[in-house]
Each structure stands twice: as structure tokens, then as C-alpha cells.
Amino acid sequence: MDLLLIIAGLVAAAAFFFLRSTTKKSLRLPPGPKGLPIIGNLHQMEKFNPQHFLFRLSKLYGPIFTMKIGGRRLAVISSAELAKELLKTQDLNFTARPLLKGQQTMSYQGRELGFGQYTAYYREMRKMCMVNLFSPNRVASFRPVREEECQRMMDKIYKAADQSGTVDLSELLLSFTNCVVCRQAFGKRYNEYGTEMKRFIDILYETQALLGTLFFSDLFPYFGFLDNLTGLSARLKKAFKELDTYLQELLDETLDPNRPKQETESFIDLLMQIYKDQPFSIKFTHENVKAMILDIVVPGTDTAAAVVVWAMTYLIKYPEAMKKAQDEVRSVIGDKGYVSEEDIPNLPYLKAVIKESLRLEPVIPILLHRETIADAKIGGYDIPAKTIIQVNAWAVSRDTAAWGDNPNEFIPERFMNEHKGVDFKGQDFELLPFGSGRRMCPAMHLGIAMVEIPFANLLYKFDWSLPKGIKPEDIKMDVMTGLAMHKKEHLVLAPTKHI
């Protein structure tokens, strides 16, 4: 009897695996490179420029292809047409995030919007952000902060120009955005070179690094113990403790009744008022406040700086475009002495340069991972549930079906002619620097405000040249990829005062 039960069990098991194998084979999965047992295509991935590697694969396998990364299936989208199908037509089925160890820990178990799941909590918090934190009126309220910090940066450049020296624009712009973000988020201005700013930057960079790190347990659930052996788990635990301690100190300062009154309410002031009022169906805790602060500081500090650096890099490589941008700004502003935010709508070519820079060098080259909630079809191919989805925004920006035969060329005029109506607000799927759909970046307007004002003033106040002995063709365009895509080699230029 026992033998019969064993035989029956073996037959049932064999039938199960046979049926599962048959079902898998019947799926029409997107094509892709063959991988190795267990690790899949992990050994083929490029760590530093994954967007370039995935773009090359799209040329071999098409605008949608699949890979195996350890035990996870990955599908990559590389065309505007399929990006629209994913982010608009079927957006709701692709709103989930894969549960990755570093992201879960550093985002307060998904309370932060960028890495959280699409739940009732997410929808309520996003609505709160759009109404209370990132509305046009709230963004405008921080205008004095942006303009004051911009003038501080201009003063440093004036000093260098007086001495016929050079300036490291990469460093100056990062300092500008760090100061603006700290004042907007915390109501505090740190000394750029002081210990408080250093602590903030150290914590921020380690947080960003761990948010972008894949752990063994993410790819090989049965080998999670390797995270402990390699020290990754200890590093994650230490980093989160330092982050949490820092944010708790800021909350305690905000709650201090003896704290000096702020001229403009900072984001932390607004969030703590929401904490006191408890207007939501879900309890809003200190952990929620900290997670919302991360939504502001993690993407805000270096992305705006990266955009301006790339824009200035392209203009210095293309002198005709530089002259056209400067002529426009100087014609519109005249002898006013500075560009203010109300002037920006009158500078269409400057806006076109920003768009073209974002197209060629999207600061988030691969949109944050999504995960299929249920079985789906994209581009006629089957996408099983729990598949990780990547939209290669860098590749989409080079899609010849969307951009014609010259997608690799820097031509700002395209946004004033054949692509005049194309914008980055999520409805034009050939340009996706902020994503699109239900998971689109809610702080887009805040981010662009931090790009336009320093960029316009750099063009208005100074003429720019390369250091002696360097030609435009010598400029290296190598990238340094993290959560944001920076120019790897700092942009060092020589300023000459114009006004």
C-alpha cells in the first residue's frame, strides 16, 4: 500500500512538472540572450552603463526583450510605442515595485513613494504631496531660496572671472542644489564646506547607493545568507541607523517650541503639521514623515545639478547653440542684471536646450523598476506576473521611429519645429525623464525650477570657454551612473563677465 502511494505521488509530481513545463513553453515570451543555469544573464550585465548595454541588446532582439537575472525574469522596453502601451494603456497592471532588500529598508518599508507599492496608502500620500508639497503655489513659495542661492553661486563665478581663472561647474551646481534642497526641506542653510553639510552628503550618498544595490536575497532567495557573509547586511543596517538618527534629529528640532520662526515653511514644517492634524484614514507617523522627506532629498539633490551640467556641456561643444541661447536670454532680459523666474516662459530656446539635454542624457536613464501584477501582453508577447519591467529611457530617447534619422545629434531646434509640442510632463512617451503614469515623479515642477534659474543666469551673466589647450572635441562624455546619471569627468570652464 505504501509503495502504491509513493508511486502515485511520483506520478502526480511528474505530471505537475510536465504540465508546468508545457505551460511555460506555450507562452510567447519576448526574445532575449541565452543565460547560464542559476545566474541567468547576470554575468553579462554591465555595472556602470547598463542603459548602453541594454540599448545594444535592443538592436539585436527588438524593442522588448527578456533576460534572467538570477532567479528573476526581467523585461526591457526600448521604444516610445511600447513605453506608451506599458505606462498608459496598461499602466495599472504595472504599478507594483519588486520587493528589493535595500529599497525596502532605506525607504522605511515602502513608506517612501518612489519605492513603495501602489496601495491605498500610496494614493493618499501622492495626493497629499501634489496638494501640499509640490503644487505650483508651494514651488513658487521657495522662489526666494532658489534665487538667493543662485546669486551666491554667481558671486563665486564672478570672483573666478576677476582672477581669469576656471570654475568647476559640476561642483558649484551640486553645492547650489544641496543648499536649495536643505533650505526647502529642513529650513536650514548648511555651510557648504562645514561638518553638517558633509554629514548630510555622506548619509545621502550612502542612501542612494544602497537604494540602487541588488542584494543576493533579491536574486537568489535561498542564498540570502551571502548578504551577511559579504557584509552587505551589516552595511545596510548601519546606513539605515545613521539615516534614521539624522532625520529624527531634524524632527525633534522642528518640534522644539523654542525653535526660531521660519520665514517660509519648509517641507518638514508642513509634514509635521500634517502629523499633528492626522487628516488621513491611515495613521501618519514619524516614520511616514521621514519617508516623505526622503522623497524630497534623494531625487532632488543631484538630479538638477546633473541636468545643468549636461546642458552646459552640450552648449560648449556646440558654439552656435551656445550663442543662440545667450542671444535669446540677453535680448529678453536686457540690462536688468539677472534672470528671475517670471522671465523663463519668455525663453523658448533655453527650454528647448533643456529638453534636448534631457533627451540625450536623461538623468534617470532607466526608470525605476516596475513589476507585473498579473499576466499581461506587451507588443504581442506574454509577460508573466511578477516579471520585473525596465523602461530604458535612454534608449527610448534614441528611438528612430520617434525621433527620425538623427536621434544621436544635439539639435535643440527640433523642439521648436517638428517636435514643438513634445514635453516631459508624461504624455509624450518619446521623452520620459520624469516617467509617466501613476508612478510618475510627483516633484517634476520643483525639479525643473531648480534647473531653469541657474542655467539661465549662467548664460546671461557670463561668456564661457574651455581651459587653454582643450578643444570641444576633447570633452569626454562618459557617464557615472547611480540613481542619477552624472557626467563622469567634472565640467571645468573659464568664465568671462558679460554683465
Curated annotation (Swiss-Prot):
Q: Which example biological process does GO assign this protein? A: shade avoidance
Q: What is its main location?
A: membrane
- Disruption outcome: Runt phenotype (small plants with hooked leaves). Epinastic leaves and defect in root development. High levels of endogenous free auxin. Altered tryptophan genes regulation.
Q: Where in the cell is it found?
A: Membrane
UniProt GO cellular component terms: endoplasmic reticulum; mitochondrion; plasma membrane
Q: Which cofactor does it need?
A: heme
Query: The organism sits in which domain of life?
Result: Eukaryota
In short, the EC number is: 1.14.14.45
Listed transmembrane segments: 3-23
Instruction: Summarize the record's induction comment.
Output: By auxin and continuous red light. Stimulated by DOF1.1 and, transiently, by the generalist herbivore S.littoralis.
**Membrane protein topology class:** Single-pass membrane protein
Keyword annotations for this protein, in alphabetical order, are:
Growth regulation, Heme, Iron, Membrane, Metal-binding, Monooxygenase, Oxidoreductase, Transmembrane, Transmembrane helix
> What is a single molecular function from GO for this protein?
iron ion binding
Q: Which reaction does it catalyse?
A: (E)-(indol-3-yl)acetaldehyde oxime + glutathione + reduced [NADPH--hemoprotein reductase] + O2 = (E)-1-(glutathione-S-yl)-2-(1H-indol-3-yl)acetohydroximate + oxidized [NADPH--hemoprotein reductase] + 2 H2O + H(+); (E)-phenylacetaldehyde oxime + glutathione + reduced [NADPH--hemoprotein reductase] + O2 = (Z)-1-(glutathione-S-yl)-2-phenylacetohydroximate + oxidized [NADPH--hemoprotein reductase] + 2 H2O + H(+)
Please verify whether the record's keywords include Transmembrane helix: yes
Residues recorded as binding heme, renumbered to this chain, are: C441
| Coiled coil (UniProt feature) | none
The family this protein is said to belong to: Belongs to the cytochrome P450 family.
Q: What else is known?
A: The sur2 mutant phenotype can be complemented by exogenous auxin or low pH medium. Plants overexpresseing SUR2 show decreased apical dominance.
Q: What does this protein do?
A: Involved in the metabolism of aromatic oximes. Catalyzes the oxime metabolizing step in indole glucosinolate biosynthesis by converting indole-3-acetaldoxime into indole-3-S-alkyl-thiohydroximate. Probably required for glucosinolate activation in response to pathogens. Functions in auxin homeostasis because indole-3-acetaldoxime also serves as a precursor for auxin biosynthesis. Specifically metabolizes (E)-p-hydroxyphenylacetaldoxime into an S-alkyl-thiohydroximate.
Protein's recorded name: Cytochrome P450 83B1
Native species of this protein?
Arabidopsis thaliana (Mouse-ear cress)
